[in-house]
Regions:
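Hydrophobic, glycine- and aromatic-enriched re-entrant/interface helices and adjoining loop segments
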Residues: 113-119, 218-312, 331-338
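Alpha-helical transmembrane segments of multi-pass membrane proteins, especially transporters
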Residues: 130, 165, 169-174, 178, ...
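Membrane-helix boundary/helix-loop-helix interface segments in multi-pass membrane proteins
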Residues: 2-32, 36-37, 43-192, 354-369, ...
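Interfacial segments of multi-pass membrane proteins
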Residues: 199, 203-218, 282-308, 365-379
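Hydrophobic alpha-helical segments of polytopic membrane proteins
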Residues: 94-95, 100-101, 175-191, 195-235
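Hydrophobic alpha-helical transmembrane segments
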Residues: 69-77, 302-323
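Hydrophobic residues within the alpha-helical transmembrane core of Major Facilitator Superfamily
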Residues: 105, 133, 206-207, 347
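Loop-to-helix entry and N-terminal half of a specific, functionally important transmembrane alpha helix
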Residues: 327-365, 371
Length: 429
């Protein structure tokens, strides 16, 4: 009697660093758009910071030198991540999540700055929430891609699965499980407190599930849960002084508006259609707090006017459209979800930053990608851009492999048809 043996499937082997594949034209155009945004951002940062740098640091080039240095480091990191195999990143999401949680806990024991604990000081400062956003993109994409597709018919019995059971399993596997790791991150960010980090991280993870192929029922369940959570927060906002002060400055009239928001609106109004000219901002002369960071878009509006603001927005829109094209043409579902998450981070940060600057949303302290000063943010953004390069080249390689396979099949079918002997039934053999 022959006994069948079950062999375990060996884990797929791969090199950590590999050549992803050829460069598609869309990826080249996307990189060109990224380069324009980065150069534009450096010009505006220097214009917004040279007065502040001289008055605060004694060096007009202080902020721009720091940004250029971090840009150099970020480009090196981008090159590294563009060569890292996405399967290695997927395997490291578990250890990366543990490290991220440990760092978020360590931040709570650091010295507060402006009433918040957001920076970890280890010889230099690291904003751990930026690392958390990157980690949650990778982890949420991994869990969402891993969720099995549930059929309404039981494959074993062939019977129809009860609607309630099917819906419950879908909500658990496609919504609750991918978002479960977000809960500890949100709690730790709330203890800092860092409301903008909570909003962005939650919005990014939600966008991954929304655009990643979750059904309408799952989207409805997630949206309903988010609305109920927001309602609960607003009902108990009096017990959170940090949020109450931000909301009061947003809902009341100009007399109670925060100085940052008020000066930001002055800057936008002063710019008019064409602006005061590059370098001619008045509000950046220490009138507008955080002119080099969260409110740099106000300086753009003041110096370049409505035209300059529209150009910045259109550049980001073009960048996002090209990036989403790369994501949706990736080689597998995991890469697609990671690409969606990275583009969602850029989109939400741009939207929230402009909304805060124009007083459409309360002041939450969200930077403008590639424009605002901040080493941790810039380096991690460029690391994510490296992942996008890997995704774009991997998708092009997969496309060429499919085309070659299709051509090979067509060639074999053609050879097979040419080698077939056709017999005429009217002719005797």
């Amino acid at each position: 009697m022959r006994i069948a043996t079950i062999r375990r499937k060996k884990p797929e082997s791969f090199a950590i660093l590999s050549s992803p594949g050829p460069w598609p034209q869309v990826l080249i155009n996307w990189l060109a758009t990224l380069a324009v945004i980065i150069v534009f951002g450096l010009i505006m940062l220097f214009s917004a910071s040279y007065t502040t740098g001289y008055l605060r640091m004694g060096d007009s080039f202080y902020y721009i030198k720091s940004q250029v240095f971090c840009l150099g480091l970020g480009l090196a990191v981008m090159l590294l991540f563009s060569r890292i195999d996405h399967r290695f990143l997927r395997r490291m999401v578990g250890p990366g999540y543990v490290v991220c949680i440990v760092m978020l806990i360590a931040v709570l024991f650091s010295a507060p700055l402006n009433g918040c604990r957001r920076w970890l000081r280890i010889g230099f400062t690291i904003q751990v929430s930026e690392i958390a956003k990157f980690e949650m993109i990778l982890l949420t994409a991994h869990l969402a891609a891993k969720a099995p597709h549930l059929e309404k018919l039981d494959p074993a019995s062939g019977r129809r699965v009860p609607a309630g059971q099917w819906l419950y399993q879908r909500i658990v596997r496609e919504l609750i499980v991918p978002l479960l790791p977000l809960i500890p991150v949100v709690i730790l960010l709330m203890l800092e407190p860092h409301m903008s980090g909570i909003v962005l991280t939650t919005a990014i993870c939600g966008t991954i599930l929304l655009l990643g192929g979750s059904g309408g029922i799952i989207t409805w369940a997630g949206g309903t849960s988010a609305v109920l959570l927001l309602r609960t927060v607003l009902e108990h906002i009096d017990s959170i002084p940090y949020l109450q002060s931000r909301l009061d400055g947003w809902t009341h009239d100009l007399s109670k508006m925060t100085d940052q928001t008020l000066q930001s609106l002055y800057a936008i109004g002063s710019g008019g259609v064409t602006g005061l000219g590059l370098g001619n901002s008045i509000e950046k002369q220490l009138w507008l707090p955080e002119s080099t960071n969260d409110f740099i878009f106000s300086v753009v509006c003041e110096e370049l006017g409505f035209v300059g603001a529209v150009i910045v927005i259109l550049l980001f829109v073009l960048f996002l459209v090209q990036g989403l094209w790369l994501a949706f043409h990736a080689e597998n579902r995991y890469c697609t979800l990671v690409g969606i998450g990275i583009m969602a981070q850029i989109a939400w940060q741009v939207f929230c930053n402009i909304a805060v600057v124009t007083n459409t949303l309360p002041n939450t302290g969200i930077s403008l990608p590639f424009f605002s000063s901040g080493g941790t943010s810039l380096i991690l953004l460029l690391a994510e851009m490296g992942v996008m390069i890997n995704i774009g080249r991997g998708g092009e390689r997969a496309r060429l492999e499919r085309e070659n396979l299709r051509a090979l099949r067509e060639q074999r079918e053609k050879e097979k048809s040419n080698n077939t002997i056709w017999l005429d039934p009217n002719v005797g053999y």
